[in-house]
Amino acid sequence: MTDYENTDNAATSATSSVSGATKSNEFTTWEDVDELNPQLLRGIYAYNFEKPSHIQQRSILPIMRGHDVIAQAQSGTGKTGAFGVATLQVIDLDPKKTDVQALVMAPTRELAKQIRDVITNLGTQMAGLKVQLLVGGTSTDDDAKMLKAEMPQIVVGCPGRVFDMIRRRNINARNIKLLVLDEADEMLSSGFKDQIYNIFQHLGNNVQVCLFSATMPQELHVLSEKFMRDPVKILVHAEQLTLEGICQYHIALEDDDGKFATLQDLFKTISMSQCIIYCNSVKRVSDLTEAMVLKGYPACCIHSGMDKDARDDAYDNFKAGKYRVLISSDVTARGIDIQQVSTVINFDLPKSVHTYLHRIGRSGRWGRKGTGISFVTRRDLRQLKEIEIYYNTTICELPSSFIH
């Protein structure tokens, strides 16, 4: 195993380990990649990917060259761009190729939709490119008809709907040559494990498999041993994940009763472009949203109890700037990339150290400075300490003079 220091890139300050890769599998500028499709290169620059991020520099070439890949990087470092560029490079746009060639799966509708948008935007210069979204909450018959009519090279979706299309033989899984799992740890822990394993059983023996995630629990290593062949491993050790560029603070409270008043005081004190507030339950999200709206704050919400159209409308309106505040359960904690989000507030401290990383990572996207503020009651003190130990960081109390 070879270690490389990340002194050349500010996206992360952690040490990475690259196993199974050599220096020839890395690059520093897009022009270094001689085999890159010129149409794709134009799309990359049009999407403002001027310089490849750390994870892109180390993962794109191994994928392009046919290796299985396990890639771990903290949130906001360009994982979607990494597998998006690689996927667009490996597909064949020959109109005679009518089967789905690449399958990208994510744990939530919102993340799948965003991945579809990124891949589509990166490939705007690639004539004949077709990317289809497969998620729950839409008509399965319409999805099947579109698969038949459009014959997309790339499908992006959630495991449930994807497996349904495979089971119905609307997708010929045997001819898929690349499978990408984004936020794979979340999919394995949130009820998708059986569906993912079922999908693997339908794939051909030579399918290329790539796993991307901010965390790599043991279950992912078990999956890799079952379905991957000598994968290139690009890992950031968990204890070294530092959330570079994000200022982290906590506000100490006696109990939950003082949270809403504290939140109002916070909004009077700090200025922010856009803000995401996380709660630990659907009811908390609904109650807080109602209270914020009654106080005149431009707030909307997303939680798992909403139907697809309502969630999409809220997300699109927030992204467009119609609302400055998004109140959410953990359904948006992974992969949602809105560059205007400068502040994340944990109204409830997350119960998982991994979720803390994903939530706070919604701020400070693509090298921008961000702020994460957590409300911490007396009963949360042990969890706060666990987070600090796990990420080898200190989350200081927000100073009374803080102005953001």
Q: Where do the model's predicted regions map?
A:
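Conserved helicase RecA-like core
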Residues: 2-10, 18-404
